[in-house]
Amino acid sequence: MSQPRTVTVLGATGSIGHSTLDLIERNLDRYQVIALTANRNVKDLADAAKRTNAKRAVIADPSLYNDLKEALAGSSVEAAAGADALVEAAMMGADWTMAAIIGCAGLKATLAAIRKGKTVALANKESLVSAGGLMIDAVREHGTTLLPVDSEHNAIFQCFPHHNRDYVRRIIITASGGPFRTTSLAEMATVTPERAVQHPNWSMGAKISIDSATMMNKGLELIEAYHLFQIPLEKFEILVHPQSVIHSMVEYLDGSILAQIGSPDMRTPIGHTLAWPKRMETPAESLDFTKLRQMDFEAPDYERFPALTLAMESIKSGGARPAVMNAANEIAVAAFLDKKIGFLDIAKIVEKTLDHYTPATPSSLEDVFAIDNEARIQAAALMESLPA
């Protein structure tokens, strides 16, 4: 019998983290948990660490260290806290690391995991959006296997087995269109956060649900795909597919189109990366084609979803613009969730920040963090200028 594969989950208490742990806990004979991390959710982190007999549990907020230590009392799990502890957890040398810390906060730990030269399952798309060049350079330098977790990128990965770019005519990234695909602009102006997080197909965290509603998520995914697959931007196409059954497609020069199809359950792409290059059984529902009455496709509406246009313009411009856009979007989404701005204001804040702040191309992680911080300051200040 082979040795259990050692695993670390960065962002263990979020939506992706929960799904990852669900699969690991169903297969504890095959996986040994090295470290689990969370931002502030002490209870879920401690419970998961004890259930999986993790070696270490790390809470990002250092003020919660004593709470975590108390929650782990009586177990063999080590407690640690703070930003440096997150990076240390990523560097503990697990065979497989899930990078699922939301936003730019996960950048440093994700890069640390990549530098260990093992396998990294990437669910933190913001890492590639803000620091794509640096990330891909590190993957190449350290011989790391980088596996995409986002359903669309995982689908492309599965449909692109030999990664021979010369054979590809186009890559089609599908989008559900979110909860407001057919909603008028007038109605979108009044939607609440509670309504906006209700995705029609996927179960996701609040931030990514809002990104899906604005279609910024699809823009971020386009940038991520551009870095992951190193395909010219003009070969990518976004296609709205409301049923979320086809997760993405690759068309080859001979006219063949390979599509990855399945029920909308994140445990499928997570399971693919967890077992890769093998396969594992997951509890995802098997697709019943006899009940699939139709599959619809339509072009995205760039006028009603300007965030998608902003993302496309950012990657075309390159440099620091994707990092600025990502930071401004995180600030705007947080403000919307706090009911400080309206839904349509999210894209306005991002656009204003891009207009006001044009830094030089980052050449180091420190540059990325400086750009990210300044973009957040600018976005927060620009929110004050919005009409009441």
Swiss-Prot record:
Optimum temperature is 50-60 degrees Celsius. The keyword Transport does not apply. Its cofactor is Mg(2+); Mn(2+); Co(2+). The keyword Transport does not apply. Keywords: Cobalt, Isoprene biosynthesis, Magnesium, Manganese, Metal-binding, NADP, Oxidoreductase. It holds the Pfam family DXPR_C. Pathway: Isoprenoid biosynthesis; isopentenyl diphosphate biosynthesis via DXP pathway; isopentenyl diphosphate from 1-deoxy-D-xylulose 5-phosphate: step 1/6. Optimum pH is 7-8. NADPH binds at residues 13-16, 40-41, 124, 126, 205. Competitively inhibited by the antibiotic fosmidomycin. Requires divalent metal cations for activity. Prefers Mg(2+), Mn(2+) or Co(2+). Is inactive with Zn(2+), Ni(2+) and Fe(2+). InterPro entries: DXP_reductoisomerase, DXP_reductoisomerase_C, DXP_reductoisomerase_N, DXPR_C, DXPR_C_sf, NAD(P)-bd_dom_sf. Its EC number is 1.1.1.267. Belongs to the DXR family. This is 1-deoxy-D-xylulose 5-phosphate reductoisomerase.
